[in-house]
């Protein structure tokens, strides 16, 4: 472990001293630490501190048309280290719990005006403050010189490099489509040139120079020194490679994925991403698989495993299971333990311990996969993960939020309250206000900071550590919950038009509606309004007690959040392929499995007011098509955007989000839902594109009888 840390530190310093990047062969030549080729490539691939990208090079002396293009493998230094924006802003500024550098931005640019006057800069020029030293140590870069640190920040912190004008890069004329022209506060330079991808070369009509009068004047206004200007091109290119090529090329020599012989995938060969506060759904363990009822099977985007947790380590670009993960989980659930000692390990390696804070297994990365947090699912969902939140008292003991401790007043928030606030903070698009949670304990007021995992007394300034650990579930507990009766106590609340004799404990039943029934006619009329020339062959009601209960629970939650007001609920269409019908009936709509119906208004499940729109997505090799008429809790909606992965926050309300997105606020016809609990697949319509019903033997018999009776 010590040798790996030394190697990471040396590689980082070599790269930053060389302008943030080095060709792989040159890095090997300069490296003093004794590392073999395989060991170095594993280090670069697995530690999360570097990116290996391919960058085109052109042979010297070759013309643009006949240039002998080759490619070099470049290693770039990566870091999550950032400057604190609140510290740069107006007073009172940052409270000091940000885990980011308190440093002047213009010092990084090498051109702070206070350097020339000898006056003290309010934003700080001292890297050696207790706060900054702690931040540097946390990121493992406290050994870098000032110049090396500046290079690392410039190519990783997106707030530092000047913005490129995208309008300048579009349209004709000397300023492209930029209406501000010379008054534009962004740089007028070819964005493809900065990315190393401009195919026009010297004949490009966009500027390729930072030193022309317009660009230089702009850069001087922004405070960049002449030395930094001379390095800008390589820095922009480094930043582009880190942002856009790292995930695809960081694997130096990936191992081929082995065959998946069972539903429990022992090796996960997907791309490795650095840990983030929020758990991606693709790294969640499938709750339906644990209940042995996942209809998506191999197409399921969640992990299939027999436990609600899974401990793995990174080996050769693939995640592999750790041995004795029940013992690891039991230790991890204890907040007083920050590691577990290993005397033996999987795959023939020997490591000393598994560190829960750094998530390192010896020299390599480790991770814990788990089921969804219990606060995101209805109470009757089994084997969700109960996360417990603790704070450390003055005696070094961990106290659970909302529980009575010895000599401590009870907090006004529970673990569930903290968990909900934490997930809101982790959600995409959450603003800065979501990073803190205010509460009381006795007569004292506190603030919990999710970024730093600390709580602060707002009067005395006392700071305490905070910890989040799961409630332990043994394999025996899992078996017991799987086998026990998971039905809710009391009578089931079902629609009065459902068939009570067709309610399976798990799964669903399709009930074919009589064409003469009022229920059939209602569905037919909605469908027929925009598809009058198509023939409805069959309409079935979907009876899935599990999905219905979840839908009703979601409706109650939305109603509470809406101050008790009724939630906007609509009947909307969704066209699909026959291949996905049973999976949708079993587990609801999931665009990651069933496919996208567009991304214009966000990445979610699309529903339409008109059957004619959904028909375009009702794919079939025959004349027979499938379409759902679903109940959808659209709630409060907003116009969508292609970049949305969830609805945005409401204006002025950091923890309140819209419920869905639409194509038009004045006349919405398309709705995008990101949370599947807001949908219930109520009816399945099977229809034909033929305007006449297909002839069947029964029709011929009836016609024959009619003809005979007339003789």
Swiss-Prot record:
Subcellular location: Nucleus; Golgi apparatus, trans-Golgi network; Cytoplasm, Stress granule
Annotated GO CC locations: nucleus
Residue(s) carrying ADP-ribosyl aspartic acid: 610, 621
Domain WWE: 308-371, 374-468
Catalytic reactions on record: L-aspartyl-[protein] + NAD(+) = 4-O-(ADP-D-ribosyl)-L-aspartyl-[protein] + nicotinamide; L-cysteinyl-[protein] + NAD(+) = S-(ADP-D-ribosyl)-L-cysteinyl-[protein] + nicotinamide + H(+)
Family indicated by similarity: Belongs to the ARTD/PARP family.
Official protein name in the record: Protein mono-ADP-ribosyltransferase PARP12
Source organism per UniProt: Mus musculus
């Amino acid at each position: 472990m010590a040798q790996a840390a030394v190697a990471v530190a040396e590689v980082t310093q070599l790269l930053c001293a060389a302008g943030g990047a080095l060709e792989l062969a040159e890095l090997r030549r300069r490296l003093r630490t004794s590392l073999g080729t395989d060991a170095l490539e594993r280090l670069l691939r697995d530690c999360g501190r570097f990116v290996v990208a391919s960058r085109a090079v052109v042979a010297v002396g070759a013309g643009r048309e006949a240039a002998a293009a080759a490619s070099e493998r470049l290693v770039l230094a990566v870091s999550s280290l950032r400057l604190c924006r609140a510290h740069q802003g107006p007073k009172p500024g940052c409270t000091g719990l940000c885990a980011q550098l308190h440093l002047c931005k213009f010092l990084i640019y090498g051109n702070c005006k206070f350097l020339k006057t000898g006056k003290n800069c309010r934003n700080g020029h001292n890297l050696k403050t207790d706060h900054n030293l702690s931040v540097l140590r946390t990121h493992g870069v406290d050994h870098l010189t000032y110049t090396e640190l500046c290079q690392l920040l410039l190519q990783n912190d997106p707030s530092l490099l000047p913005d490129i004008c995208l309008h300048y890069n579009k349209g004709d004329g000397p300023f492209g489509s930029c209406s501000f022209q010379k008054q534009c506060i962004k740089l007028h330079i070819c964005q493809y040139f900065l990315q190393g991808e401009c195919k026009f070369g010297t004949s490009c009509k966009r500027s390729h120079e930072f030193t022309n009068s317009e660009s230089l004047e702009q850069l001087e206004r922004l405070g960049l020194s002449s030395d930094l200007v001379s390095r800008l091109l390589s820095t922009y290119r480094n930043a582009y490679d880190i942002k856009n090529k790292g995930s695809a090329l960081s694997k130096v020599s990936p191992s081929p994925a082995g065959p998946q012989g069972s539903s429990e995938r022992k090796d996960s060969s997907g791309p490795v991403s650095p840990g983030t506060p929020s758990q991606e759904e693709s790294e969640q363990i499938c709750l339906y698989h644990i209940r042995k009822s996942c209809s998506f099977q191999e197409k399921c985007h969640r992990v299939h495993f027999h436990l609600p947790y899974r401990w793995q380590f990174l080996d050769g670009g693939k995640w592999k299971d750790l041995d004795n993960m029940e013992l690891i989980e039991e230790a991890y659930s204890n907040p007083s333990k920050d590691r577990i000692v290993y005397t033996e390990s999987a795959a023939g390696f020997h490591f000393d311990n598994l560190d829960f804070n750094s998530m390192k297994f010896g020299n390599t990365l480790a991770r814990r996969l788990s089921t969804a947090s219990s606060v995101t699912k209805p109470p009757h969902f089994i084997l969700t993960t109960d996360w417990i939140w603790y704070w450390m008292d003055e005696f070094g003991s961990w106290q659970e939020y909302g529980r009575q401790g010895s000599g401590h007043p009870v907090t006004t928030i529970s673990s569930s309250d903290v968990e909900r606030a934490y997930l809101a903070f982790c959600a995409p698009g959450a603003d800065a206000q979501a990073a803190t949670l205010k509460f009381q304990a006795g007569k004292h007021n506190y603030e919990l900071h999710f970024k730093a995992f600390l709580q602060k007394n707002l009067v005395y300034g006392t700071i305490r550590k905070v910890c989040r650990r799961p409630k332990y579930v043994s394999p025996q507990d899992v078996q017991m919950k799987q086998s026990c009766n998971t039905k809710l106590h009391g009578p089931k609340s079902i629609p009065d038009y459902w068939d009570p004799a067709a309610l399976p404990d798990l799964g669903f039943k399709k009930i074919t509606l009589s064409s003469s029934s009022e229920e059939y006619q209602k569905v037919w009329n909605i469908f027929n309004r925009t598809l009058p020339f198509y023939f409805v062959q069959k309409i079935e009601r979907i009876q899935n007690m599990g999905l219905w209960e979840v839908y009703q629970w979601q409706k109650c939650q939305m109603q509470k959040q809406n101050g008790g007001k009724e939630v906007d609920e609509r009947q909307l269409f969704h066209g699909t392929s026959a291949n996905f019908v049973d999976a949708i009936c079993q587990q609801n709509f999931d665009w990651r499995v069933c496919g996208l119906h567009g991304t214009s208004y966000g990445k979610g499940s699309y529903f339409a007011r008109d059957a004619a729109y959904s028909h375009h997505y009702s794919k079939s090799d025959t004349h027979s098509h499938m379409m759902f008429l679903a109940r959808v809790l659209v709630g409060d909606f907003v116009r969508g955007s292609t970049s949305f992965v969830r609805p945005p926050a409401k204006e002025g309300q950091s923890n309140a989000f819209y419920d869905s997105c639409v194509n038009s606020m004045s006349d919405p016809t398309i709705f995008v839902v990101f949370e599947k609990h807001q949908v219930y697949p109520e009816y399945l319509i099977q229809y034909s594109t033929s305007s006449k019903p297909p002839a069947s033997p029964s029709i011929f018999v009836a016609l024959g009888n009619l003809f005979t009776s007339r003789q």
